[in-house]
Amino acid sequence: MKNTTHLILGMLALTFGMEVKAQIQLPSVFSDGMVLQQNSKVAVWGWGNPSETLMILSEWNPGDTVRTVVDNQGRWKAEVPTGRAGGPYTLEVKGGNDSRKLSDVMLGEVWLCSGQSNMEWSADMGIMNGEQEVKQAACPSVRIFHNPKQGADTPQTDCRTKWEVATPESMRKTSATAYFFARYLTEHLKVPVGILVSAWGGTPAEVWTPADIVEKDEILSKNKLKDYPWWPIKPGVLYNQMIHPLVPYQIAGCIWYQGESNHENAPSYARLVSKMVEAWRKDFGWDFPFYYVQIAPHTYGAKNNTPALLREQQELMLGQVKNTAMINISDLVENVKDIHPRNKRAIGERLACLAMDKVYGQFTGAYESPRLASAELQKGKIVVNLEGNFSTLQSTTPHITGLVLTDGKGDTLTVKAKIKGKQIILPVRKLNPPYRVSYCFDEATIGSLRTEAGMPVLPFCTKPIEKQ
């Protein structure tokens, strides 16, 4: 009798398992309230009964039914054309005996938002004007897919979350930078905006990079950070669970706010993130825009000036990886002892101004910081030339804060620098080359140089200057 009972239960379990397997399933990134990238062919995928033909019907394009066949492994994928921004719509996947229908689907712009604590930082954690911003966060055209903090040793195919409409309750728990970025875009583009938020405080870039890329690269493998007890540090562990399940969801681009946890291995940072971006672009199928925030002034108490070297690496990436851009936020720092600048609205909106200009062709506000172009010795003076989309420099203090001149002996020289258009001119009375000119090239100095639009100058350190 006992054996018969076990046999019946086993057959029921097997039957139930077969039925579950036969059901049409979608990953959680496809759920009610989602945003699909407008004017493109978006990938839609999931699981089902092997060899079954599925039909995908979109309410925005009712005359075009997309068909696909489930493969022998029970997986399927199809490309579904989208049109102009709008909604709400339905999206349905139908099989012979089962179907899945999604509602409140919007067509608009989709951005991946990733990084460490400054990207993760929410209104609940404390932001400028937080209570007021939360109260005003009812924004139905902004949709949030907040990926829970979880790692995995191997690439995963799904994560446990769902799309949510931006409300005071959902906004206060997600990335403030990402939310303000999305809100600015939807206000200016007049289209729905969806944000895929995958961020975890304290994490180095290695965890967001496929493990084999780090381990097989001699430089990256040698320079990877040692184990740390408080947050993930193993290469690939967050890529596997917080990026890979989103692949190949169609995105317009990515914003990235990370770097603080990599200052100790700063010299290889540009190499690391360049390879990470390359891997992500391969996964998502195109060279999407990758925009990021240069780490802000902060009193790390680090050795060997590593935070300055990290910022230098972040700027170096601009010349190494195509379709990238960076914003500087040193002017938004209120307390250099706090590694988390609290004016997340200004940071998110500065990133949005960058995207509005570069991606959507609409200039809505300043975002670009001047960069060092060259420095040379001319008849008893050093001329530092800056480049960028600005007309003239100005200083918010009588003497330029953060500007340092050293001579061939390593002595710091006190000089009164002058500003002339895009140039900084430093008189040199006693010639003792080679000279170096640096600006905010340390941990925490907030410089006084600004453009006429108020944008801060990027930190820099010149090469030795000795020829006239």
For each predicted feature, which ranges?
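Bacterial Sec-dependent N-terminal signal peptides
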Residues: M1-Q25
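Cell-envelope and extracellular/periplasmic
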Residues: Q23-Q468
